[in-house]
Amino acid sequence: MAAARGAWCVPCLASIETLQELCRKEMLICTNIGITRKNLNNYEVEYLCDYRIEKGVEKFFVKWKGWPESCNTWEPTRNLKCPTLLKQFYSDLYNYFCALKPNKKGFLKNSIKSLDPSLSDYIVKKAKQRIALRRWEEELNRKKTHSGTLFVENTVDLEGPPMDFYYINDYKASPGVNTLGEAIVGCDCSDCFKGKCCPTEAGVLFAYNEHRQIKIPPGRPIYECNSRCKCGPDCPNRVVQKGPPYSLCIFRTDNGRGWGVKTLQKIKKNSFVMEYVGEVITSEEAERRGQQYDSRGITYLFDLDYEADEFTVDAARYGNVSHFVNHSCDPNLQVFNVFIDNLDVRLPRIALFSTRNIKAGEELTFDYQMKGSGDFSTDSIDMSPAKKRVRIACKCGAATCRGYLN
Protein backbone atom coordinates (compact mmCIF):
# COMPACT_ATOMS: atom_id res chain seq x y z
CA MET A 1 0.00 0.00 0.00
CA ALA A 2 1.14 3.53 -0.64
CA ALA A 3 -0.10 7.09 -0.49
CA ALA A 4 -0.09 8.59 -3.97
CA ARG A 5 0.64 12.13 -5.18
CA GLY A 6 0.02 12.02 -8.88
CA ALA A 7 2.42 9.42 -10.26
CA TRP A 8 4.63 9.60 -7.19
CA CYS A 9 4.22 6.88 -4.53
CA VAL A 10 5.58 6.71 -1.00
CA PRO A 11 5.79 3.35 0.77
CA CYS A 12 3.69 3.32 3.93
CA LEU A 13 6.52 1.66 5.86
CA ALA A 14 9.61 3.82 5.35
CA SER A 15 12.25 5.36 7.60
CA ILE A 16 12.27 9.09 8.35
CA GLU A 17 15.53 9.35 6.43
CA THR A 18 13.97 7.76 3.34
CA LEU A 19 10.96 10.09 3.51
CA GLN A 20 13.25 13.11 3.88
CA GLU A 21 15.18 12.09 0.78
CA LEU A 22 11.97 11.59 -1.20
CA CYS A 23 10.67 15.01 -0.12
CA ARG A 24 13.86 16.72 -1.24
CA LYS A 25 13.78 14.95 -4.58
CA GLU A 26 10.18 16.04 -5.14
CA MET A 27 10.73 19.52 -3.61
CA LEU A 28 8.04 18.94 -0.98
CA ILE A 29 7.99 20.76 2.36
CA CYS A 30 6.99 18.53 5.28
CA THR A 31 7.64 20.07 8.68
CA ASN A 32 6.50 16.90 10.50
CA ILE A 33 9.69 15.15 9.39
CA GLY A 34 11.93 18.21 9.53
CA ILE A 35 11.82 19.31 5.87
CA THR A 36 11.29 23.09 5.90
CA ARG A 37 11.60 25.86 3.34
CA LYS A 38 15.01 26.75 4.77
CA ASN A 39 16.59 23.31 4.48
CA LEU A 40 14.69 21.90 1.51
CA ASN A 41 17.64 22.34 -0.83
CA ASN A 42 20.29 21.14 1.61
CA TYR A 43 22.27 18.14 0.40
CA GLU A 44 24.01 15.61 2.63
CA VAL A 45 27.34 14.08 1.69
CA GLU A 46 27.23 10.29 1.82
CA TYR A 47 30.90 9.74 1.05
CA LEU A 48 33.84 11.23 -0.86
CA CYS A 49 34.93 9.38 -4.01
CA ASP A 50 37.91 11.23 -5.44
CA TYR A 51 40.24 14.19 -5.02
CA ARG A 52 42.10 16.65 -7.21
CA ILE A 53 43.64 20.09 -7.15
CA GLU A 54 42.24 22.30 -9.90
CA LYS A 55 43.78 25.77 -10.40
CA GLY A 56 45.13 25.65 -6.87
CA VAL A 57 41.75 24.72 -5.36
CA GLU A 58 41.17 21.41 -3.55
CA LYS A 59 38.10 19.59 -4.86
CA PHE A 60 36.36 16.38 -3.89
CA PHE A 61 34.10 14.17 -5.99
CA VAL A 62 30.99 13.83 -3.82
CA LYS A 63 28.39 11.07 -3.60
CA TRP A 64 25.19 12.72 -2.34
CA LYS A 65 22.98 10.78 0.03
CA GLY A 66 19.71 9.77 -1.59
CA TRP A 67 20.96 10.46 -5.11
CA PRO A 68 22.37 8.03 -7.69
CA GLU A 69 26.09 8.02 -8.51
CA SER A 70 25.31 9.69 -11.84
CA CYS A 71 24.56 12.82 -9.80
CA ASN A 72 28.00 12.93 -8.17
CA THR A 73 29.66 16.35 -8.42
CA TRP A 74 33.06 17.94 -7.90
CA GLU A 75 32.93 20.37 -4.97
CA PRO A 76 35.54 22.67 -3.42
CA THR A 77 36.33 22.05 0.24
CA ARG A 78 34.51 25.24 1.28
CA ASN A 79 31.19 23.73 0.10
CA LEU A 80 31.55 20.65 2.30
CA LYS A 81 30.23 20.60 5.85
CA CYS A 82 31.41 17.10 6.70
CA PRO A 83 34.60 17.22 8.80
CA THR A 84 34.21 13.60 9.90
CA LEU A 85 34.02 12.33 6.31
CA LEU A 86 36.99 14.49 5.30
CA LYS A 87 39.02 13.07 8.17
CA GLN A 88 37.99 9.55 7.18
CA PHE A 89 38.95 10.21 3.55
CA TYR A 90 42.47 11.27 4.50
CA SER A 91 42.73 8.36 6.92
CA ASP A 92 41.88 5.93 4.12
CA LEU A 93 44.53 7.54 1.90
CA TYR A 94 47.11 7.26 4.65
CA ASN A 95 46.32 3.59 5.31
CA TYR A 96 46.45 2.83 1.59
CA PHE A 97 49.92 4.34 1.18
CA CYS A 98 51.17 2.70 4.38
CA ALA A 99 50.06 -0.68 3.05
CA LEU A 100 51.93 -0.07 -0.22
CA LYS A 101 55.09 1.19 1.48
CA PRO A 102 55.18 -0.14 5.07
CA ASN A 103 58.53 1.54 5.78
CA LYS A 104 57.27 4.98 4.79
CA LYS A 105 55.33 7.29 7.07
CA GLY A 106 52.49 7.59 4.59
CA PHE A 107 52.02 10.60 2.36
CA LEU A 108 52.05 14.37 2.38
CA LYS A 109 48.59 15.69 1.64
CA ASN A 110 49.86 18.70 -0.30
CA SER A 111 52.02 16.52 -2.56
CA ILE A 112 48.99 14.88 -4.24
CA LYS A 113 47.45 16.63 -7.23
CA SER A 114 45.01 13.87 -8.14
CA LEU A 115 44.31 10.25 -7.32
CA ASP A 116 45.23 7.25 -9.41
CA PRO A 117 42.06 5.44 -10.63
CA SER A 118 42.98 2.36 -8.57
CA LEU A 119 43.24 4.52 -5.45
CA SER A 120 39.94 6.31 -6.02
CA ASP A 121 38.35 2.89 -6.64
CA TYR A 122 39.72 1.72 -3.28
CA ILE A 123 38.39 4.85 -1.56
CA VAL A 124 34.89 4.23 -2.95
CA LYS A 125 34.96 0.54 -2.00
CA LYS A 126 36.10 1.44 1.50
CA ALA A 127 33.31 4.00 1.86
CA LYS A 128 30.68 1.54 0.65
CA GLN A 129 32.08 -1.12 2.96
CA ARG A 130 31.86 1.26 5.92
CA ILE A 131 28.22 1.99 5.12
CA ALA A 132 27.42 -1.72 4.74
CA LEU A 133 29.11 -2.59 8.04
CA ARG A 134 27.28 0.23 9.83
CA ARG A 135 23.94 -1.04 8.50
CA TRP A 136 24.85 -4.58 9.54
CA GLU A 137 25.78 -3.33 13.00
CA GLU A 138 22.40 -1.63 13.28
CA GLU A 139 20.67 -4.82 12.13
CA LEU A 140 22.51 -6.93 14.71
CA ASN A 141 21.50 -4.57 17.50
CA ARG A 142 17.87 -4.59 16.37
CA LYS A 143 17.78 -8.38 16.45
CA LYS A 144 19.73 -9.14 19.63
CA THR A 145 17.69 -9.42 22.82
CA HIS A 146 20.45 -9.03 25.42
CA SER A 147 21.61 -5.86 27.16
CA GLY A 148 25.12 -5.59 25.70
CA THR A 149 25.69 -3.55 22.53
CA LEU A 150 27.31 -5.07 19.44
CA PHE A 151 29.82 -3.19 17.28
CA VAL A 152 31.45 -4.08 13.94
CA GLU A 153 34.93 -3.00 12.88
CA ASN A 154 37.15 -3.70 9.87
CA THR A 155 40.38 -1.74 9.52
CA VAL A 156 42.18 -4.59 7.77
CA ASP A 157 40.64 -5.24 4.35
CA LEU A 158 37.54 -4.66 2.20
CA GLU A 159 35.52 -7.60 3.53
CA GLY A 160 31.90 -6.65 4.18
CA PRO A 161 29.10 -8.33 6.14
CA PRO A 162 28.74 -12.10 5.63
CA MET A 163 26.25 -12.72 2.84
CA ASP A 164 24.56 -15.86 4.19
CA PHE A 165 24.39 -15.38 7.95
CA TYR A 166 21.24 -14.80 9.99
CA TYR A 167 21.39 -13.56 13.57
CA ILE A 168 19.35 -15.53 16.12
CA ASN A 169 19.19 -15.41 19.91
CA ASP A 170 18.15 -19.01 20.64
CA TYR A 171 18.50 -22.44 19.11
CA LYS A 172 16.78 -22.86 15.73
CA ALA A 173 15.33 -26.36 15.48
CA SER A 174 15.69 -28.21 12.20
CA PRO A 175 12.80 -30.46 11.04
CA GLY A 176 12.25 -33.33 13.46
CA VAL A 177 14.07 -31.67 16.37
CA ASN A 178 12.24 -30.14 19.35
CA THR A 179 14.30 -27.64 21.32
CA LEU A 180 11.33 -26.00 23.03
CA GLY A 181 10.94 -28.40 25.95
CA GLU A 182 8.83 -26.91 28.72
CA ALA A 183 9.66 -27.31 32.38
CA ILE A 184 7.02 -29.27 34.29
CA VAL A 185 7.70 -27.84 37.73
CA GLY A 186 9.54 -24.90 39.21
CA CYS A 187 10.68 -23.71 42.61
CA ASP A 188 8.80 -21.50 45.06
CA CYS A 189 11.86 -20.30 46.98
CA SER A 190 12.02 -16.87 48.57
CA ASP A 191 15.83 -17.02 48.33
CA CYS A 192 17.15 -19.36 45.64
CA PHE A 193 20.78 -18.72 46.60
CA LYS A 194 20.17 -20.12 50.08
CA GLY A 195 17.64 -22.72 48.99
CA LYS A 196 19.78 -24.15 46.14
CA CYS A 197 16.38 -25.16 44.74
CA CYS A 198 16.50 -26.24 41.09
CA PRO A 199 20.06 -27.62 41.14
CA THR A 200 19.25 -29.65 44.26
CA GLU A 201 16.16 -31.11 42.57
CA ALA A 202 18.38 -32.12 39.63
CA GLY A 203 20.95 -33.66 41.96
CA VAL A 204 23.73 -31.20 41.09
CA LEU A 205 25.59 -28.35 42.76
CA PHE A 206 24.40 -24.73 42.72
CA ALA A 207 26.52 -23.23 39.94
CA TYR A 208 27.01 -19.60 41.01
CA ASN A 209 28.44 -17.58 43.88
CA GLU A 210 26.86 -14.44 45.31
CA HIS A 211 28.30 -12.42 42.39
CA ARG A 212 26.71 -14.72 39.78
CA GLN A 213 30.08 -16.10 38.80
CA ILE A 214 30.54 -19.77 38.02
CA LYS A 215 31.98 -21.75 40.95
CA ILE A 216 31.63 -25.33 39.75
CA PRO A 217 34.39 -27.06 37.77
CA PRO A 218 34.11 -27.67 34.01
CA GLY A 219 32.10 -30.78 33.26
CA ARG A 220 29.45 -30.11 35.90
CA PRO A 221 26.07 -29.06 34.45
CA ILE A 222 24.28 -25.82 35.31
CA TYR A 223 20.59 -25.99 36.23
CA GLU A 224 19.03 -22.53 36.31
CA CYS A 225 15.58 -21.53 37.54
CA ASN A 226 12.97 -21.84 34.79
CA SER A 227 9.71 -20.27 33.61
CA ARG A 228 7.73 -22.26 36.21
CA CYS A 229 9.75 -20.91 39.11
CA LYS A 230 8.18 -18.21 41.24
CA CYS A 231 11.40 -16.27 41.69
CA GLY A 232 11.78 -13.04 39.75
CA PRO A 233 14.25 -11.91 37.05
CA ASP A 234 16.78 -10.83 39.69
CA CYS A 235 17.12 -14.37 41.03
CA PRO A 236 20.84 -15.26 41.41
CA ASN A 237 20.14 -18.52 39.58
CA ARG A 238 19.11 -16.72 36.39
CA VAL A 239 22.34 -15.87 34.58
CA VAL A 240 22.70 -17.49 31.17
CA GLN A 241 19.02 -16.91 30.33
CA LYS A 242 19.49 -13.13 30.67
CA GLY A 243 21.93 -13.06 27.76
CA PRO A 244 25.37 -11.48 27.31
CA PRO A 245 25.75 -8.42 29.57
CA TYR A 246 28.84 -7.03 27.84
CA SER A 247 29.36 -4.78 24.84
CA LEU A 248 31.28 -6.77 22.24
CA CYS A 249 32.91 -5.95 18.90
CA ILE A 250 33.03 -8.19 15.84
CA PHE A 251 36.33 -7.22 14.23
CA ARG A 252 38.47 -8.28 11.29
CA THR A 253 41.69 -9.98 12.38
CA ASP A 254 44.99 -9.02 10.74
CA ASN A 255 46.55 -12.50 10.67
CA GLY A 256 44.25 -14.42 8.34
CA ARG A 257 41.76 -15.70 10.94
CA GLY A 258 38.81 -13.84 9.39
CA TRP A 259 36.40 -12.22 11.84
CA GLY A 260 36.94 -12.34 15.58
CA VAL A 261 35.22 -11.00 18.70
CA LYS A 262 36.71 -8.73 21.36
CA THR A 263 35.22 -7.35 24.52
CA LEU A 264 34.89 -3.60 24.99
CA GLN A 265 34.55 -3.97 28.75
CA LYS A 266 36.54 -5.65 31.49
CA ILE A 267 35.28 -9.16 32.25
CA LYS A 268 35.99 -10.73 35.61
CA LYS A 269 37.09 -14.34 35.93
CA ASN A 270 34.29 -16.95 35.94
CA SER A 271 31.71 -14.54 34.44
CA PHE A 272 29.11 -15.56 31.86
CA VAL A 273 30.00 -14.03 28.49
CA MET A 274 27.77 -15.54 25.78
CA GLU A 275 25.91 -18.60 24.52
CA TYR A 276 26.83 -20.68 21.50
CA VAL A 277 23.62 -20.89 19.46
CA GLY A 278 22.77 -22.09 15.99
CA GLU A 279 20.64 -24.58 14.11
CA VAL A 280 20.13 -27.85 16.02
CA ILE A 281 20.48 -30.79 13.64
CA THR A 282 20.78 -34.55 13.96
CA SER A 283 24.19 -36.20 14.07
CA GLU A 284 23.47 -37.77 10.69
CA GLU A 285 22.82 -34.35 9.13
CA ALA A 286 25.95 -33.04 10.85
CA GLU A 287 27.94 -35.79 9.16
CA ARG A 288 26.65 -34.69 5.76
CA ARG A 289 27.24 -30.98 6.37
CA GLY A 290 30.63 -31.67 7.89
CA GLN A 291 31.89 -32.99 4.58
CA GLN A 292 30.75 -29.78 2.85
CA TYR A 293 32.33 -27.52 5.47
CA ASP A 294 35.48 -29.63 5.33
CA SER A 295 36.17 -28.60 1.76
CA ARG A 296 35.76 -24.93 2.71
CA GLY A 297 37.94 -25.12 5.82
CA ILE A 298 35.30 -23.74 8.20
CA THR A 299 34.42 -24.92 11.71
CA TYR A 300 30.93 -24.34 13.08
CA LEU A 301 29.62 -27.77 14.19
CA PHE A 302 29.35 -28.28 17.95
CA ASP A 303 28.25 -31.72 19.15
CA LEU A 304 25.75 -31.77 22.04
CA ASP A 305 27.26 -34.78 23.77
CA TYR A 306 26.60 -34.14 27.46
CA GLU A 307 25.06 -37.61 27.88
CA ALA A 308 24.18 -38.64 24.34
CA ASP A 309 25.47 -37.83 20.89
CA GLU A 310 22.26 -37.39 18.90
CA PHE A 311 22.32 -33.69 18.09
CA THR A 312 24.74 -31.03 16.88
CA VAL A 313 24.60 -27.22 16.83
CA ASP A 314 25.44 -25.78 13.41
CA ALA A 315 26.23 -22.05 13.60
CA ALA A 316 27.36 -21.68 9.99
CA ARG A 317 24.24 -19.84 8.74
CA TYR A 318 22.23 -19.20 11.90
CA GLY A 319 23.91 -17.97 15.06
CA ASN A 320 24.73 -15.09 17.34
CA VAL A 321 27.98 -13.26 18.11
CA SER A 322 29.59 -16.59 19.10
CA HIS A 323 29.62 -17.48 15.38
CA PHE A 324 32.59 -15.12 15.04
CA VAL A 325 34.60 -16.24 18.09
CA ASN A 326 37.93 -17.75 17.08
CA HIS A 327 39.71 -20.81 18.41
CA SER A 328 42.72 -20.68 20.69
CA CYS A 329 44.78 -23.46 22.21
CA ASP A 330 45.08 -21.17 25.26
CA PRO A 331 41.54 -19.70 25.43
CA ASN A 332 39.95 -17.26 27.84
CA LEU A 333 36.47 -18.84 27.60
CA GLN A 334 35.27 -22.24 28.85
CA VAL A 335 32.24 -24.28 27.75
CA PHE A 336 29.50 -25.32 30.20
CA ASN A 337 26.27 -27.26 29.61
CA VAL A 338 23.16 -25.43 30.83
CA PHE A 339 19.57 -26.58 31.43
CA ILE A 340 16.73 -24.11 31.96
CA ASP A 341 13.29 -24.84 30.49
CA ASN A 342 14.33 -27.75 28.32
CA LEU A 343 15.59 -30.47 30.68
CA ASP A 344 16.26 -32.98 27.90
CA VAL A 345 19.85 -34.08 28.59
CA ARG A 346 20.34 -34.53 24.84
CA LEU A 347 19.79 -30.80 24.27
CA PRO A 348 21.81 -28.70 26.70
CA ARG A 349 22.40 -25.03 26.04
CA ILE A 350 26.07 -24.15 25.54
CA ALA A 351 27.36 -21.28 27.69
CA LEU A 352 30.80 -19.69 27.56
CA PHE A 353 32.32 -18.38 30.81
CA SER A 354 35.59 -16.50 31.30
CA THR A 355 38.51 -18.55 32.61
CA ARG A 356 40.43 -15.49 33.84
CA ASN A 357 40.15 -11.72 34.06
CA ILE A 358 39.86 -10.31 30.53
CA LYS A 359 40.90 -6.76 29.66
CA ALA A 360 38.81 -4.37 27.58
CA GLY A 361 39.92 -4.69 23.95
CA GLU A 362 41.09 -8.29 24.36
CA GLU A 363 39.95 -10.94 21.86
CA LEU A 364 37.61 -13.65 23.15
CA THR A 365 38.46 -17.25 22.27
CA PHE A 366 37.55 -20.79 23.20
CA ASP A 367 39.11 -24.15 22.44
CA TYR A 368 37.27 -25.86 19.58
CA GLN A 369 38.38 -29.23 20.97
CA MET A 370 37.10 -28.58 24.49
CA LYS A 371 33.98 -30.45 25.56
CA GLY A 372 31.49 -29.22 28.12
CA SER A 373 33.15 -31.74 30.42
CA GLY A 374 36.36 -29.74 30.23
CA ASP A 375 38.20 -32.62 28.60
CA PHE A 376 39.80 -32.62 25.19
CA SER A 377 37.80 -34.64 22.72
CA THR A 378 37.37 -35.41 19.06
CA ASP A 379 33.61 -35.14 19.60
CA SER A 380 33.32 -31.44 20.26
CA ILE A 381 33.20 -28.58 17.80
CA ASP A 382 33.51 -29.44 14.15
CA MET A 383 34.78 -32.94 14.77
CA SER A 384 32.33 -35.33 13.16
CA PRO A 385 34.05 -38.36 11.58
CA ALA A 386 33.93 -36.61 8.22
CA LYS A 387 36.04 -33.76 9.61
CA LYS A 388 38.83 -36.06 10.81
CA ARG A 389 40.01 -36.69 7.27
CA VAL A 390 41.29 -33.14 6.78
CA ARG A 391 43.38 -31.26 9.32
CA ILE A 392 42.86 -27.51 9.61
CA ALA A 393 45.93 -25.49 10.58
CA CYS A 394 45.67 -23.41 13.76
CA LYS A 395 46.71 -19.74 13.67
CA CYS A 396 46.04 -18.87 17.31
CA GLY A 397 49.68 -18.02 18.03
CA ALA A 398 49.55 -19.33 21.60
CA ALA A 399 52.74 -20.68 23.17
CA THR A 400 50.88 -23.94 23.73
CA CYS A 401 49.47 -24.11 20.17
CA ARG A 402 48.82 -27.69 19.05
CA GLY A 403 49.22 -26.75 15.39
CA TYR A 404 45.76 -27.81 14.24
CA LEU A 405 42.14 -27.02 15.04
CA ASN A 406 41.26 -30.71 14.88
Curated annotation (Swiss-Prot):
<dbReference type="InterPro" id="IPR023779">
    <property type="entry name" value="Chromodomain_CS"/>
</dbReference>
<dbReference type="Pfam" id="PF05033">
    <property type="entry name" value="Pre-SET"/>
</dbReference>
<comment type="similarity">
    <text>Belongs to the class V-like SAM-binding methyltransferase superfamily. Histone-lysine methyltransferase family. Suvar3-9 subfamily.</text>
</comment>
<feature type="binding site">
    <location>
        <position position="229"/>
    </location>
    <ligand>
        <name>Zn(2+) 2</name>
    </ligand>
</feature>
<dbReference type="InterPro" id="IPR003616">
    <property type="entry name" value="Post-SET_dom"/>
</dbReference>
<dbReference type="GO" id="GO:0140949">
    <property type="term" value="F:histone H3K9 trimethyltransferase activity"/>
</dbReference>
<feature type="binding site">
    <location>
        <position position="300"/>
    </location>
    <ligand>
        <name>S-adenosyl-L-methionine</name>
    </ligand>
</feature>
<feature type="binding site">
    <location>
        <position position="187"/>
    </location>
    <ligand>
        <name>Zn(2+) 2</name>
    </ligand>
</feature>
<keyword id="KW-0131">Cell cycle</keyword>
<feature type="binding site">
    <location>
        <position position="198"/>
    </location>
    <ligand>
        <name>Zn(2+) 1</name>
    </ligand>
</feature>
<keyword id="KW-0221">Differentiation</keyword>
<keyword id="KW-0949">S-adenosyl-L-methionine</keyword>
<keyword id="KW-0158">Chromosome</keyword>
<feature type="binding site">
    <location>
        <position position="225"/>
    </location>
    <ligand>
        <name>Zn(2+) 2</name>
    </ligand>
</feature>
<dbReference type="GO" id="GO:0001702">
    <property type="term" value="P:gastrulation with mouth forming second"/>
</dbReference>
<keyword id="KW-0156">Chromatin regulator</keyword>
<dbReference type="GO" id="GO:0008270">
    <property type="term" value="F:zinc ion binding"/>
</dbReference>
<feature type="binding site">
    <location>
        <begin position="257"/>
        <end position="259"/>
    </location>
    <ligand>
        <name>S-adenosyl-L-methionine</name>
    </ligand>
</feature>
<dbReference type="GO" id="GO:0032259">
    <property type="term" value="P:methylation"/>
</dbReference>
<feature type="binding site">
    <location>
        <position position="187"/>
    </location>
    <ligand>
        <name>Zn(2+) 1</name>
    </ligand>
</feature>
<dbReference type="InterPro" id="IPR023780">
    <property type="entry name" value="Chromo_domain"/>
</dbReference>
<dbReference type="InterPro" id="IPR016197">
    <property type="entry name" value="Chromo-like_dom_sf"/>
</dbReference>
<keyword id="KW-0862">Zinc</keyword>
<dbReference type="GO" id="GO:0010172">
    <property type="term" value="P:embryonic body morphogenesis"/>
</dbReference>
<comment type="function">
    <text>Histone methyltransferase that specifically trimethylates 'Lys-9' of histone H3 using monomethylated H3 'Lys-9' as substrate. H3 'Lys-9' trimethylation represents a specific tag for epigenetic transcriptional repression by recruiting HP1 (CBX1, CBX3 and/or CBX5) proteins to methylated histones. Mainly functions in heterochromatin regions, thereby playing a central role in the establishment of constitutive heterochromatin at pericentric and telomere regions. H3 'Lys-9' trimethylation is also required to direct DNA methylation at pericentric repeats.</text>
</comment>
<dbReference type="InterPro" id="IPR001214">
    <property type="entry name" value="SET_dom"/>
</dbReference>
<feature type="domain" description="Chromo">
    <location>
        <begin position="43"/>
        <end position="101"/>
    </location>
</feature>
<feature type="binding site">
    <location>
        <position position="394"/>
    </location>
    <ligand>
        <name>Zn(2+) 4</name>
    </ligand>
</feature>
<feature type="binding site">
    <location>
        <position position="235"/>
    </location>
    <ligand>
        <name>Zn(2+) 3</name>
    </ligand>
</feature>
<keyword id="KW-0539">Nucleus</keyword>
<keyword id="KW-0678">Repressor</keyword>
<keyword id="KW-0805">Transcription regulation</keyword>
<dbReference type="InterPro" id="IPR000953">
    <property type="entry name" value="Chromo/chromo_shadow_dom"/>
</dbReference>
<dbReference type="InterPro" id="IPR011381">
    <property type="entry name" value="H3-K9_MeTrfase_SUV39H1/2-like"/>
</dbReference>
<feature type="binding site">
    <location>
        <position position="189"/>
    </location>
    <ligand>
        <name>Zn(2+) 1</name>
    </ligand>
</feature>
<dbReference type="GO" id="GO:0000775">
    <property type="term" value="C:chromosome, centromeric region"/>
</dbReference>
<keyword id="KW-0137">Centromere</keyword>
<feature type="binding site">
    <location>
        <begin position="326"/>
        <end position="327"/>
    </location>
    <ligand>
        <name>S-adenosyl-L-methionine</name>
    </ligand>
</feature>
<feature type="binding site">
    <location>
        <position position="225"/>
    </location>
    <ligand>
        <name>Zn(2+) 3</name>
    </ligand>
</feature>
<feature type="binding site">
    <location>
        <position position="396"/>
    </location>
    <ligand>
        <name>Zn(2+) 4</name>
    </ligand>
</feature>
<dbReference type="GO" id="GO:0005634">
    <property type="term" value="C:nucleus"/>
</dbReference>
<keyword id="KW-0479">Metal-binding</keyword>
